[in-house]
Regions:
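Conserved beta-strand-loop-short alpha-helix elements that form
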Residues: 140
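Active-site region of the double-stranded beta-helix
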Residues: 4-5, 38-137, 145-177
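N-terminal auxiliary "cap/dimerization" subdomain that precedes the catalytic jelly-roll/cupin core
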Residues: 1-57
Length: 178
């Protein structure tokens, strides 16, 4: 659970040093039933939805603006804003796969990525890490790092992108929103 500054300090150090970082939070902070996920999709503004029918994938952007989103999403956005440098932009996207279907082949992003696994399981391969992410697992992937994500079942993964210059060190504590 994100109740002290250890997570923020570890994440900030990993971002500053451009190292992969793994952690986890209480899965109840991200747990949602499929009915609430479908409601989130159905009520999300059309201009903030991207659909890839050939991969059974839906992407919802700017979730932090929604009142119905899990509070942890807004908490993570605030954390990233607090440790980011001026001029950086923080993005959030929910990747929803409605089957165990291919996702992304080997890729590297031009921005730093923080993945939060919310529902279902995915196989993540990044550097020397080859692990199954389950609800509550968090992984930071520095920009330019090769990685592969393979859904093992229907899933929801929150992805936070950080564009711009390098992250500064965390200066303050970080607590979960109630």
């Amino acid at each position: 659970m994100l109740t002290n500054s250890n997570f923020a300090k570890g994440l900030s150090a990993a971002m500053h040093n451009k190292q992969v970082f793994e952690s986890c939070i209480d899965s109840e902070l991200v747990n949602q039933n499929w009915d609430s996920i479908i409601d989130l999709i159905d009520s999300h503004p059309d201009n903030l939805i991207e659909r890839e029918p050939n991969k059974n994938r839906i992407m919802l952007t700017a979730l932090y603006k929604r009142g119905s989103v899990k509070p942890i999403i807004k908490t993570i956005i605030r954390l990233l804003e607090s440790i980011s440098t001026s001029g950086q932009r923080i993005y959030d996207t929910a990747f929803i796969n409605l089957s165990k279907h291919e996702s992304y082949s080997l890729r590297k992003d031009t921005m730093d990525i923080l993945l939060l696994q919310a529902k279902g399981r995915i196989q993540l391969e990044v550097k020397k890490i080859n692990k199954v992410l389950e609800s509550g697992d968090i992984v930071y992937i520095p920009r330019g790092t090769d990685y592969t994500i393979t859904p093992l079942q229907s899933r929801v993964t929150y992805c936070f992108g950080i564009e711009g210059e390098a992250i500064k060190s965390a200066q303050s504590g970080f607590g979960a929103e109630s």
